[in-house]
């Protein structure tokens, strides 16, 4: 009897969890279409800004922080985009794993990485381990707004534009999850600064030489001058890239949460079925034992009467 009570209790608690998982899956399902569309709609603007930066870099060949890497400055900024909430499968753990791998590679190369973290789960992870974090942001990782992108880009731009002797960094990296589709989300490492010129037909093959740069984009006239245009466009470039990464990361988080909750719901239902079979088997065994005892008692009484 005690075994049956324990099974009933487990079935009830698992059924309660199954309802929670199913509700979370439905909520994520209702958000994913909007999150995906927002991420896709932000891409054309980001691409246009990047094309403008490419044009500036390709046709000026000037000495500007946007393209010049300070080889004497070992400090590097790394931004990790995690989530505020859990129940999203391996979403945050995958980001942290890739971030740790990047930090290790930078350390091995003689760099001094400075970590920036967006998302409560990542902030808690590094705070619990007493790791130094240069900047943190929390809130609305599944629906990031322009405000948080502005805040992050300002902090990173301030760090990038500072002189080396004042604690400035020479490179900016961002670790995020790119939304591919509902099933596939890829963790990526993007170097935002300095900018590397890439020709359209050479996407993914790395930077190109200055001799090929003039073929990358059409000719432009820059007013009032190239330096002022670069100074004006650089903050917009960083903010737009970060905002796009935040949006695609939000879509990835929502998709990951939906997939995780769908799997959890299926597992809960499977466990309920398994526990129900065990409960039925226990009941059947209990009934069989009671019948056996009754029949045995009746036989004993009959023999006694004889």
Predicted regions: what they are:
Residues 1-306:
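C-terminal beta-strand-loop-alpha-helix "lid" module of Rossmann-like NAD(P)-dependent dehydrogenases
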């Amino acid at each position: 009897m005690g075994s049956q009570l324990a099974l009933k209790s487990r079935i009830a608690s698992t059924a309660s969890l199954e309802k929670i998982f199913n509700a979370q899956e439905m909520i994520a399902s209702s958000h994913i279409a909007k999150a995906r569309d927002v991420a896709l709609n932000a891409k054309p603007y980001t691409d246009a800004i990047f094309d403008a930066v490419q044009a500036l870099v390709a046709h000026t060949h000037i000495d500007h922080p946007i393209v010049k890497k300070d080889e004497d400055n070992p400090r590097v900024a790394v931004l990790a985009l995690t989530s505020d909430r859990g129940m999203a499968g391996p979403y945050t753990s995958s980001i942290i794993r890739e971030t740790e791998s990047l930090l290790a590679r930078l350390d091995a190369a003689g760099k001094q990485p400075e970590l920036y973290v967006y998302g409560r789960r990542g902030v808690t992870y590094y705070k619990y381990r007493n790791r130094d974090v240069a900047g943190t942001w929390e809130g609305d990782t599944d629906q990031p707004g322009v405000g948080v992108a502005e805040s992050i880009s300002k902090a990173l731009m301030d760090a990038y534009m500072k002189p080396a002797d004042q604690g400035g960094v020479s490179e900016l990296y961002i670790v995020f999850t790119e939304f591919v589709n509902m099933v596939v989300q890829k963790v990526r490492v993007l170097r935002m600064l300095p900018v590397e010129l890439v020709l359209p037909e050479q996407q993914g093959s790395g930077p190109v030489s200055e001799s090929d740069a003039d073929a990358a984009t059409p000719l432009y006239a820059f007013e009032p001058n190239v330096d002022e245009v670069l100074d004006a466009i650089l903050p917009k470039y960083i903010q737009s890239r970060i905002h796009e990464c935040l949006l695609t990361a939000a879509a990835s988080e929502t998709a990951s949460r939906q997939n995780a909750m769908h799997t959890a719901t299926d597992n809960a239902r499977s466990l309920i079925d398994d526990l129900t079979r065990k409960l039925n088997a226990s009941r059947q065994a209990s009934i069989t034992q009671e019948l056996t005892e009754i029949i045995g008692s009746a036989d004993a009484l009959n023999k006694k009467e004889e």
